[in-house]
Each structure stands twice: as C-alpha cells, then as structure tokens.
Amino acid sequence: MIADIINPATLGFILVAVMLFAIFVGFPISFTLIFLGFVFGYLGFGPLVFYLMTLQFSMVMTEQALAAVPLFVFMGIMMEQAGLMERLFSSVQLMLARVRGSLYYAVLFVSVIFAAATGIVGASVTILGIMAAKSMNKSKYDVRLAAGTITAGGTLGILIPPSIMLVVMGPIMEIPVTDLFAAAIIPGILLALLYAGYTTLRCWQNPSLGPVLPEEMRATSMKQVWIEFFLGLVPPAALVFAALGSILFGFATPTEAAGCGAMGAMLLALAYKKLTFNKLQEALVKTLEITALIMVLVAASNFFGSVFSRLGTPMVLTDFLLGLEVNKYFILFIVMAMIFLLGWPLEWVPIVLIIIPIILPLIESLGFNLTWFAILVAVNLQTAWLSPPVALSAYFLKGVVPEWDLKDIYIGMMQFMVLQIVGLILIIIFPQLVLWLPTLIYGQ
C-alpha cells in the first residue's frame, strides 16, 4: 500500500492540491471529488474506502434537514415564475415615489424579501436587474450606485434565512439549522441598513444620484397606494415571514415550514392568476435540477472530507498552526482571506462543502463559536461576490442590463464591498450581533 511509503497526512495534502487544480481547470466538481476521494482513499487505507463512500452517500440522502432544500428552492422559483417579486417592487415603488432615492430603497426592500424566498444569488440579482434597471434608467438614476445597490441586495440571498446555503451548512458543521437562521437575521438586517444608509447619504450629498420619480411613475391617488400595499406587498412578505417565524419560534421544523412555504407560493400564484401548467412544470424541473446538483455535491464532498480526515491531514494542519503561537485572530484572518480569495472564482457550494470541513477542526481547536464562524463565512462569501476581478454578480447584472457598462457596474459594486467589510469587522468585534438572538430564542 502506498501509505507505507508516503505518510498518509502528506497524501492528504497532495489530495487537496490535485482537487483544487482539477476544479480550477474546469473538471465537474462532484465527479472530481468522488474520483479523487476514491483513488486517494484506496491508496491510503485500502478497501475500506468502498464502505466509506456508501456510508457517506447514504447519510446525506437520509438527512432530514436537507429535505428542506427542494421545498425552499421550489418556493422561490414559484414566486419568481408567478411575478410576485415584480408586483412587490411596483408596490414599494409607488409608496415611496415622492422620496428621493426611492428606487434604491425599493430594491433593497425587495431584495430582503426575495433573498429570504430564494436564497439563490444569481436569481436575485437577475430578477432585481430586470425589475429595477428600466425604472432607474427612466428616472435618470446614477448607474454606478444603481448597479451597486442591485448586486449588493442580490447577494443577501446567501445570508438572510431561509438561505439555502445555511440549510446545507448546518449538517456539514453539525449546527442546528434553526440556530443558523436565528444567527443570520441581525447581520442580514445590519448589512441592509448599511446599504440604505449609504444610499441615503449619497443622495443627500448629491440629489441628482436619485431624483424624485416623475409624475407618470407615481400613484394617482392614495387609494391606489393602499390597494398596491395590500395586494402587492402584504401577501408575499407575509408568506416569507410566516415560513421563517414558524421555524424560529419552534412551531415547525425547517422542512415543515419549507413545505408550507412551497404550498403558499402556489396558492399566491393561483390567487394572482399566474399559475399555469407550463409554469408549474418549469418550476418543478428547475427545482429538480438545482436539488440534484446540491445533493450530489453534498454527498460527494462528505465522502471527500471523510477520506481527507481519515488520512489525518486536518490534525497535522491544526497542530502546525496552533504550534506557531500566534494570536488566534491572526489565524482567523488567514482563514477568512483564503475563503475570500476562493470566493472569487467559485460558487459557495464547493467552498462550504469542501473547504469548511477541512478547516473546521482548526476553528474548534481555537475555541471560536461555530455558529458565529458560519455567519462570518456567509458574509465573507457575500463580499467575494462583490469583488473584482471575477465578481459573478456583475456578469449576472450585465446579462440582463446590457446597456450598463461593466466598468460602471464594477465601480458601483466596490462601494458596497467596502460596506461588506465594515459589516464583517463589526461582526468580528461584536459577536453578540450573531449570538444574541439564538441565545434569546433557544437559550443556548
């Protein structure tokens, strides 16, 4: 066996290097993880790798918490298909029409609701761009500030519960999903308020950045405003808050709440006369595609991680870093910097499923709270989505608003990237921003 020649821990380092190279070259992530895990596992500890692979796949497919994934995905897609977010944006736009910078606030409000409904950044940025860009162009809003608001608002889908990433992260880090949901609420609101405060300050300094909407885009009467409020804003917002509230206060498990949310989204689509057989079929197919992708990735990464752990590499890495005798926050900074850089070219899925399990023993050894660390990772990945040179959010927005110059989109995003860093620093300095609400609700 090759493990008699090469130290198993060294084999683990080679495994990670080959894995990162294969992913950056462009090999499919799931098959790369399975293949490399099988090959290096067999080299390291022989036929036991067959049992390990079967066990990990079986555990993932029977994990109850992950059953919420397809239901939350379907809920978000159904709301998107039914045009509920467009109606919500129109409602907020009418109510704030006489306020300077009103479209920025409308985008941020809708992004919070839509982020909670979908948890998918690409979908959020795309829909927000389609909804808001036309009105912003017509009202002569500043392209850079508009692009920054849309992309930053769209990335809230990573953080604001019921985020799909948090649902997946819970079992990976062995943290209750309910704790992660409660922990993410205040940081999510904090970031949204930072965005809103920044746009308010910019519009106050330079009113031309967000002028008052023209007469043709305002409501003709207060009756129209109230109708839009009750028909366009209340139903989708109530659905999201009911699903989230039932989880936080223990009335339902995440899976049960996701099922109710999915049914509620269908009923709202039916009430708005937007539910057709073709749209339902399309929503189901999209849900199946996204769920299959996530589930296979989770299973493959669990198998890869178990092989990596059995080779003993995480313990060697942990002992080495702890032996440096440096401040634990310096090590945390290194970890956060690594996650930030990986967040440029990669989606959150491989980072959460591959990188986090590798560094988890180190974080536990340093004595950091895992719930707090999970939220740090989420905010960090948000920041990476807004950071050139890759900045995937920029390409999503450019795809639906081709008339906006990519340079302006980048400049707009970087303003909000700075706000993200401010938020991240606040969460590090004040951990209770994350831990207070879970402690209040669950007493932990």
How would you label these PLM feature ranges?
Residues 40, 127-139, 169-182, 311, ...:
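Membrane-interfacial helix-loop connectors
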Residues 93-168, 348-377:
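Hydrophobic transmembrane alpha-helices that form the pore/transport pathway of multi-pass ion
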Residues 6-12, 25, 61-67, 94-106, ...:
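Membrane-interfacial loop-to-helix junctions in multi-pass transporters
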Residues 4, 172, 179-290, 395-415, ...:
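Long, contiguous bundles of hydrophobic transmembrane helices that form the permeation core
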Residues 20-29, 76-80, 110-122, 150-158, ...:
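Transmembrane alpha-helix interface/packing and boundary motifs in multi-pass membrane proteins
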Residues 9-20, 25-45, 67-74, 189-195, ...:
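Hydrophobic mid-bilayer segments of alpha-helices in multi-pass membrane transport proteins
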Residues 24, 31-34, 60-86, 112, ...:
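Core transmembrane alpha-helical segments of multi-pass membrane transporters/permeases
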Residues 55-59, 87-98, 127-138, 147, ...:
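Short amphipathic alpha-helical coupling elements at transmembrane boundaries
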